[in-house]
Amino acid sequence: MKGCKKMAIFTNQAQLRYGNAVANSNVAVGEILEVLAATKTAVRKIYGQNDRVTYVVSIANSGNTAMTGLTVADDLGAYAFGTDTLVPLTYVADTVRYYSNGILQTTPAVTAGPPLSVSGISVPAGGNVTIVYEAETNAFAPLLAESEITNTVTVSGGGITPVTAKETVIAESGPKLTITKSVSPVPVTENGTLTYTFLIQNTGNTAALA
């Protein structure tokens, strides 16, 4: 999902004092256009129990000066639950890959969090950076049908106004069946009777119909 390129408007007015008189100038209006834009995309848009989600964060610099000393922070889908804050995703260690203009770079400093933090990022002038990493759903990931996880990445540092981007993944919908077969008694006497038991479990979020 794309982050928004923001534009800030500022005004300025001069005042001239001479003797007992005061003269105000017109109001000059200017615009500041952010040169960084961020997008965040999940490679797979659905998730399941104990599933891995691969995220791709892209940062583009439309300016003519490199942006250095940036930090990329991911809230890992944190959401309010009563008075608590639950985090449904856990960063998978050693999965960060950092590319500058498509070329793989040395892995930057990573703090697993939450929030996940990747620091020491530099975006070349007129260039782009891509950061790829994996997160795993944990016990706080909602699994009911139509549940979703929305997480936000924030790019900050280097004297810039923080830039954010969001991505939403949806819980996989459908039955998830397992079957276990057992036999009793064990051991059985010759010409004895065996009883087979089948246990079918559905750990999915919808019923399994015939």
Predicted features and spans:
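Exported/extracytosolic protein signature
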Residues: 2-210
